[in-house]
C-alpha cells in the first residue's frame, strides 16, 4: 500500500527569503498541485526541526508567491509612511515584508506558531523587526489593536465572519484590501438582480463600499488551491443609516431565507407570523416597562437566558395564541407589504434603500425582527450571519 503525504511540504532555505526564490517556489507549486490531494491533509506530522514545514490546505494555508501581484496589492492599498496595517494570516511573510517596507507598523495575526517563528526570523534578517507586532491567536477570537488599513491574504474558511468583524467591529479604518476566493468575491460584489446577489452583499454594503481590483490565478499560490482568487477593496462609509444593527441583521435573515421567493410568500408562513407576533409582544412589553418604570421579568417565553425555559415558553406562546389573533396579525403584515408595494417583490432584486424602507414600515407599525430581550451584540450576530 502506498501512502501519500497529507499535506504539502515547503522547504525553508535561504532561497525562500529572497526574490530569486520565485522560480523555485513556482516549480514546487506545479509539482505539488499534481501530486497531493487537498482532501488528504488533515493529520499529518509536522517536522519543523528538519528545516521544512507542512502547509495545510484545510487550514487555508496557501502562500501567494508572485512578486508582481504582491507589489500590485501594496500599490492599490495606498499605504502611508505613518500607517499601521493589520494583516490576517501572514504565513511565512511574503506580503508582510512588503507591508513593513511601506508602513510604519504591521500587526500580523497568525494562529500557527510555526509560521510565527518563520515570520520573526525572516523579518529579523531584513532588520525590520521593530515595525512588526505579531499576535499568535485565532483572528476571530483576537482583539485587534488600533489600525489604519487591512491588507491580507485571508484564509478562505473565515472570509465571511472576518469581514463581518471588520466592518461591524467598531474599529475605524480607511480600507481593507483582501485576497478572497473568486466566487466569494463575486458574491460580495453582486448587485440587485444578479444571480449571485445575497445577504452577504446586502449586509456589507449597508456600511461599506466594495471595489473589484483584479483576479489572481490559483497557480500563483503554494500549495495550489482548487479555485482562483480575487482582490477586492472594502471602504467603510462615512455615514451609515441610523438603525439597530441587530434588527437589520434579523430582518435580512428573514428576507433572504428564500431570496427568490416573493416577500408575500415568505411573510405569510404561519411559523414566521407566530415568530414576529412573539417578538412584537416582547418589544411592546419592554417599552411599556420602560415608560412605567417597572423592571419586572417578562413571561417565561420571553426569557432568553435559559434555553430550556425559552423552549417551553415557545410552546406556551403557541398554545395561548388563538387563530383569530394570528390571522389578524398576518393581515397586518400583508397590509404593510401591499402599502409599500413589496408583496410581489423578491429580496434578490431589492436595493438596500428599498429594504431599509420596508424595515422602517414594519418598525413604524410596531413589528420587530430582533429579540430585544437578548443582549445586543451586533458584531457577533453579524459575523455569525455570514456563515448561513
Give the positions of each predicted feature.
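C-terminal target-recognition/interaction regions appended to catalytic cores
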Residues: 4, 34-47, 260, 270-275, ...
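Catalytic cores of RNA-modifying enzymes
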Residues: 2-254, 357, 361, 369-370, ...
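Substrate-binding/catalytic lobe of Class I Rossmann-like enzymes that use SAM or dcSAM, i.e.
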Residues: 202-325, 331-332
Amino acid at each position: 500500500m502506498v501512502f501519500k503525504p497529507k499535506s504539502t511540504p515547503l522547504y525553508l532555505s535561504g532561497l525562500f527569503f529572497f526574490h530569486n526564490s520565485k522560480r523555485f517556489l513556482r516549480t514546487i507549486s506545479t509539482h505539488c498541485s499534481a501530486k497531493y490531494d487537498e482532501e488528504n491533509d488533515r493529520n499529518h506530522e509536522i517536522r519543523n526541526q528538519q528545516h521544512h514545514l507542512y502547509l495545510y490546505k484545510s487550514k487555508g494555508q496557501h502562500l501567494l508567491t508572485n512578486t508582481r501581484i504582491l507589489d500590485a496589492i501594496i500599490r492599490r492599498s495606498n499605504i502611508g509612511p505613518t500607517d499601521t496595517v493589520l494583516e490576517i494570516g501572514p504565513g511565512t511573510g511574503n506580503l508582510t515584508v512588503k507591508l513593513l517596507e511601506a508602513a510604519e507598523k504591521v500587526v500580523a495575526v497568525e494562529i500557527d506558531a510555526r509560521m510565527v517563528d518563520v515570520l520573526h526570523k525572516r523579518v529579523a534578517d531584513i532588520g525590520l523587526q521593530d515595525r512588526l507586532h505579531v499576535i499568535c491567536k485565532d483572528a476571530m477570537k483576537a482583539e485587534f489593536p488600533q489600525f489604519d488599513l487591512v491588507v491580507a491574504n485571508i484564509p478562505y474558511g473565515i472570509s465571511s465572519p472576518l469581514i463581518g468583524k471588520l466592518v461591524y467591529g467598531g474599529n475605524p479604518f480607511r480600507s481593507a484590501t483582501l485576497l478572497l476566493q473568486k466566487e466569494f468575491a463575486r458574491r460580495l460584489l453582486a448587485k440587485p438582480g444578479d444571480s449571485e446577489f445575497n445577504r452577504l452583499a446586502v449586509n456589507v454594503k449597508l456600511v461599506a463600499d466594495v471595489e473589484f481590483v483584479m483576479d489572481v490565478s490559483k497557480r500563483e499560490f503554494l500549495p495550489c488551491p482548487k479555485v482562483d482568487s480575487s482582490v477586492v477593496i472594502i471602504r467603510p462609509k462615512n455615514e451609515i443609516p441610523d438603525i439597530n444593527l441587530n434588527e437589520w441583521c434579523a430582518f435580512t435573515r428573514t428576507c433572504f431565507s428564500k431570496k427568490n421567493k416573493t416577500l408575500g410568500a415568505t411573510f405569510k408562513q404561519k411559523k414566521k407570523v407566530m415568530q414576529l407576533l412573539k417578538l412584537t409582544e416582547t418589544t411592546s412589553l419592554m417599552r411599556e416597562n420602560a415608560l412605567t418604570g417597572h423592571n419586572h421579568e417578562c413571561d417565561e417565553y420571553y426569557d432568553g437566558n435559559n434555553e430550556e425555559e425559552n423552549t417551553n415558553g415557545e410552546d406556551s406562546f403557541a398554545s395561548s395564541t388563538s387563530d383569530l389573533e394570528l390571522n389578524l396579525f398576518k393581515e397586518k403584515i400583508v397590509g404593510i407589504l401591499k402599502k409599500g408595494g413589496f408583496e410581489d417583490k423578491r429580496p434578490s432584486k431589492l436595493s438596500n434603500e428599498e429594504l431599509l424602507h420596508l424595515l422602517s414600515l414594519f418598525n413604524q407599525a410596531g413589528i420587530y425582527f430582533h429579540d430585544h430581550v437578548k443582549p445586543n451584540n451586533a458584531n457577533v450576530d453579524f459575523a455569525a450571519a455570514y456563515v448561513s
